[in-house]
C-alpha cells in the first residue's frame, strides 16, 4: 500500500483556517487518506477543531485519520507537512496593547501585524515560538516542509532562515491571489483570463505584469485600464467583503509608482509616511482609511465564532468550499510530482537582485517533487526597490535584535519605520518602545546579551543593557516603582506556551537608584542561509502559465 502523508497543524485552534485547509486537502485524491494531527494548547479550541475535522472527513467520505495532541513534539512525529497558524497573546491583551499604547503618543494604526511598532512587537512575541517549532522539527521530522501562515510573515520567514537554515519553509499569504480577484472584479474580466507576475516582500509585492488574454492568444496590458478607471471615478468599486475598507490607497499609489501593490489599502496605508497623519483627518476621509481596523475585526470574529462553533457542533455534515489557500496545492505537488505555481515567502538568495540576499522575498515558486523552488525575478523598478527597502530596514533590525539578543535594535527598528518616524520624534519613539516592552513583558523573550549601554529618559529613568548580566530579576521601572521580584519578560518554551522556560533572559531596565550587576555570557549567534538553487539553475515560469 502506498504510504499516505502526515499533515500536522500547530495552532489547530484556528478552527476556521484549519477547516479551509483540511477541506482543500480532503478533496485531493492524493491526500484524502492522510493522517491529520491537530495540536493546540487550548483544550476547548482543540476539541472544536477535532469535531470540525471529523465532520469534514465524514462529508467527503475520506479515509483520512484525525489525531489530536497537546504535545507539540508528539504531533510532529512522522510529519511530512507542518502547517502553522497562531497568534501569540491573542486579541487581549497583546493586540489591544499594540494599538492603545501607541495611541497615547498620537500614533494611529490600522492593522499593526506586519510593520510599525505593532509589527515589531508581534515579531518579538512570535519568532521564539516558531524557532521552538523548528528546533523540534529538526529533531523529529527534519525532512518535513513548514508551511507558515503567521504574521509578521516577512520577519518570521527571515528569522527562521537565519537560525534554522536547513528547515524547508515557505511563508504563505493570500494577498497576491486575493488582490488579483479584486482587480478582475473591478475590470469585469474573468480571473481565469488574467495573467500576472508579482514580486517584492510580503504585504508589499507589486504586480510587475497584469495582462488580459486576447482571442488571438496575445496579452494586453491592463494597467492603463486601471489608471483610467481610477481617474474617472469608476474604480475602486465598493468592497464586496468589508464596506469599511475601500481600495483607494492602492489605486493612488498606482498613479504615483506605476504598479499595483498586492496587499490591501488598509494594510499599505501604515507601511508608508503618506496617508495616516495626526491632525490630518482630511487624508483619512479622502482615502477611506479605517483606523483601528484590526481590533474591530477581532471583536467581530470572536462574536461570529460563538455562533459558528455551536452550528458546527450540531451539524450532521459541514459543507466544503474550495479556498484560495496554497497549502493543499503545495502538498499535492510535493507528494505526487504534479507541478504547480504558488507565491511564497522565502529567503531571497538573489531571486530579486535589487533587494538584500538575506531578506524574505515574495516571489513565484514552482512546486513539484523536488520541493518549493523560488524563481528568478531580477531587478525591480527603482521606485519599487526604494519603497520596499524602507520596510526591509525595519524587518532587518527586528531580526537582528532577535538573533543577537540585542534589545537596542528594537528601538532602531522603530526609528526606521516610515509611519512611526513621520509621526514621532526620537524621544517619543524611544519612550513608546519602552512602554510597549514593559506592557508586553509576560509575552516576550528574556535575553542575556546586549552591548552595555545606558540612557536616561526625561522622567529620570535610566535604561541599562549589559552583556554580562545573568540575572533577569531587575526590571524596567519608572522612578519609585521598581519591583525587584518582577522579571522583565517570561521565558518562552515549547509550542506556543508563553510560560515554559527555554530561552535566555532578556536585557533589563533599571531605575537610577539600582546598583545590581551580575555576570554571564551572551548566547552564541547562529547565522545561515536557506539553500535555494543557484540563480543560474532557477526556472522562470512559462509566459503561457496563468498564475
Where are these regions (language model features)?
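N-terminal Rossmann-like dinucleotide-binding module
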Residues: 5-32, 36
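NAD(P)-binding Rossmann-fold cofactor-contacting core
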Residues: 32-52
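Short acidic low-complexity segments
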Residues: 65-78
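Rossmann-fold NAD(P)-binding glycine/threonine-rich loop
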Residues: 93-163
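Internal, well-ordered domain-core segments that constitute the primary functional module
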Residues: 132-214
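Long, compositionally biased stretches enriched for glycine and/or charged residues
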Residues: 188-469, 474
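Intrinsic, low-complexity polybasic segments
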Residues: 475, 480-485, 494-495, 524-530, ...
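Intrinsic-disorder-associated, low-complexity terminal segments enriched in Asp/Asn/His/Tyr and depleted
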Residues: 483-485, 499, 511-513, 532, ...
Amino acid at each position: 500500500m502506498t504510504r499516505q502523508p502526515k499533515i500536522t497543524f500547530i495552532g489547530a485552534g484556528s478552527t476556521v483556517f484549519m477547516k479551509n485547509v483540511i477541506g482543500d486537502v480532503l478533496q485531493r485524491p492524493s491526500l484524502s487518506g492522510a493522517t491529520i494531527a491537530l495540536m493546540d494548547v487550548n483544550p476547548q479550541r482543540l476539541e472544536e477543531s477535532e469535531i470540525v475535522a471529523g465532520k469534514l472527513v465524514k462529508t467527503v467520505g475520506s479515509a483520512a485519520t484525525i489525531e489530536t495532541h497537546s504535545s507539540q513534539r508528539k504531533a510532529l512525529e512522522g510529519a511530512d507537512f507542518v502547517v502553522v497558524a497562531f497568534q501569540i497573546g491573542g486579541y487581549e491583551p497583546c493586540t489591544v496593547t499594540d494599538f492603545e499604547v501607541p495611541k497615547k503618543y498620537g500614533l494611529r494604526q490600522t492593522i499593526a501585524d506586519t510593520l510599525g511598532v505593532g509589527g515589531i512587537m508581534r515579531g518579538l512575541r512570535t519568532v521564539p515560538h516558531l524557532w521552538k517549532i523548528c528546533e523540534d522539527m529538526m529533531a523529529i521530522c527534519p525532512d518535513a516542509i513548514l508551511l507558515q501562515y503567521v504574521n509578521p510573515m516577512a520577519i518570521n520567514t527571515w528569522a527562521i532562515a537565519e537560525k534554522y537554515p536547513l528547515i524547508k519553509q515557505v511563508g504563505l499569504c493570500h494577498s497576491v491571489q486575493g488582490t488579483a480577484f479584486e482587480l478582475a472584479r473591478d475590470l469585469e474580466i474573468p480571473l481565469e483570463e488574467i495573467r500576472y507576475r508579482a514580486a517584492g516582500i510580503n504585504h508589499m509585492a507589486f504586480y510587475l505584469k497584469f495582462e488580459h488574454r486576447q482571442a488571438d492568444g496575445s496579452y494586453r496590458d491592463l494597467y492603463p485600464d486601471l489608471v483610467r478607471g481610477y481617474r474617472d471615478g469608476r474604480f475602486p468599486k465598493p468592497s464586496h467583503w468589508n464596506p469599511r475598507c475601500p481600495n483607494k490607497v492602492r489605486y493612488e499609489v498606482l498613479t504615483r509608482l506605476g504598479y499595483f501593490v498586492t496587499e490591501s489599502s488598509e494594510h499599505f496605508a501604515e507601511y508608508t509616511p503618506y496617508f495616516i497623519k495626526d491632525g490630518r483627518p482630511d487624508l483619512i476621509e479622502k482615502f477611506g482609511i479605517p483606523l483601528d481596523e484590526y481590533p474591530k475585526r477581532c471583536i467581530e470574529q470572536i462574536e461570529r465564532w460563538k455562533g459558528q462553533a455551536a452550528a458546527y457542533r450540531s451539524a450532521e455534515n459541514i459543507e466544503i468550499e474550495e479556498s484560495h489557500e496554497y497549502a493543499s496545492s503545495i502538498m499535492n505537488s510535493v507528494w505526487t510530482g504534479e507541478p504547480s505555481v504558488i507565491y511564497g515567502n522565502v529567503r531571497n538568495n538573489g531571486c530579486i537582485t535589487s533587494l538584500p540576499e538575506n531578506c524574505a522575498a515574495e516571489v513565484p515558486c514552482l512546486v513539484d517533487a523536488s520541493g518549493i523552488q523560488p524563481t528568478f525575478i531580477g531587478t525591480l523598478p527603482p521606485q519599487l526597490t526604494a519603497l520596499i527597502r524602507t520596510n526591509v530596514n525595519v524587518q532587518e533590525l527586528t531580526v537582528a535584535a532577535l538573533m543577537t539578543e540585542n534589545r537596542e535594535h528594537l528601538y532602531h527598528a522603530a526609528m526606521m519605520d516610515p509611519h512611526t518616524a513621520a509621526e514621532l520624534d526620537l524621544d517619543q519613539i524611544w519612550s513608546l518602545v519602552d512602554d510597549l516592552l514593559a506592557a508586553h513583558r509576560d509575552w516576550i523573550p528574556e535575553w542575556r546579551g546586549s552591548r552595555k549601554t545606558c540612557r536616561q529618559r526625561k522622567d529620570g529613568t535610566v535604561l541599562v543593557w549589559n552583556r554580562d548580566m545573568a540575572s533577569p530579576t531587575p526590571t524596567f521601572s519608572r522612578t519609585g516603582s521598581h519591583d525587584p521580584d518582577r522579571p522583565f519578560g517570561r521565558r518562552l518554551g515549547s509550542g506556543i506556551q508563553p510560560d515554559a522556560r527555554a530561552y535566555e533572559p532578556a536585557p533589563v531596565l533599571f531605575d537610577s537608584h539600582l546598583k545590581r550587576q551580575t555576570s554571564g555570557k551572551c548566547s552564541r549567534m547562529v547565522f545561515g542561509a536557506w539553500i535555494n538553487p543557484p540563480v543560474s539553475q532557477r526556472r522562470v515560469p512559462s509566459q503561457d502559465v496563468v498564475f
